[in-house]
Amino acid sequence: LHKAIRRQRQMCIRDSGNTGLNSSYLKYFVEDLARLEGYEGRDVLSNSKCLSADVNAAFDPTWSTPFEKNNSSFINEGVCVTKFTGARGKGGTSDASAEYVSFVKNLLESNGVLWQSGELGKVDAGGGGTVAMYIANLNVDVIDVGVPVLSMHSPYEIVSKIDTYMAYKAFKVFFTK
């Protein structure tokens, strides 16, 4: 790679700061790489697909108030695909297109990945942030995919071994197929 790009050894952590996903860092980095190969950065981004690795709140039967059971994820039922996220209605949200949801669904099913869909809870019950919205703003197809977590953000969180393994399989098949 060009030496100017080789010097860039930063990692995007959440959304804050000059290397976060809410900065211009990723866009500039992709534009630099694309230019070296003779492409436009916006064309590379517009033809990209992304899985945003993010957990989802699993339905908690001992504290079901913030959940809508029919739209929740559950532990031991596979990796969770979250079509939309956000809080306060549509604030801080990302909403994957139906076509991209279908692409991800077909990819997982055709490769034996156990998956489920789920929301993060009732509207305005708290939570729901995602970094996927920053990727989506670059015109990249993106959807949140991750492990359902029981008692998220509590002192004792629980995840399932099978869900974790299915998340591994989902990301592996995404990068290899």
Regions found by a protein language model. Name each.
Residues 23-82:
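A glycine- and small/hydrophobic-rich beta-loop-beta segment
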Residues 7, 37-47, 108-122:
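Flexible, glycine/charged-enriched surface loops at secondary-structure junctions
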Residues 16-21, 34, 67, 93, ...:
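Non-transmembrane, aqueous-exposed alpha-helical and coiled segments at domain scale
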Residues 15-20, 61-65, 156-158:
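Short acidic, glycine/serine/threonine-rich loops at helix termini
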Residues 10, 46-56, 121-130:
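A glycine-rich phosphate-binding loop feature that marks nucleotide/adenosyl-phosphate handling sites
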Residues 62-63, 67-154:
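Active-site-adjacent substrate-binding region
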Residues 1-13:
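Single conserved hydrophobic/aromatic residue that forms the stacking wall/gate
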Residues 147-177:
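His/Asp/Glu-rich mid-to-C-terminal helical/loop segments that flank catalytic regions of hydrolases
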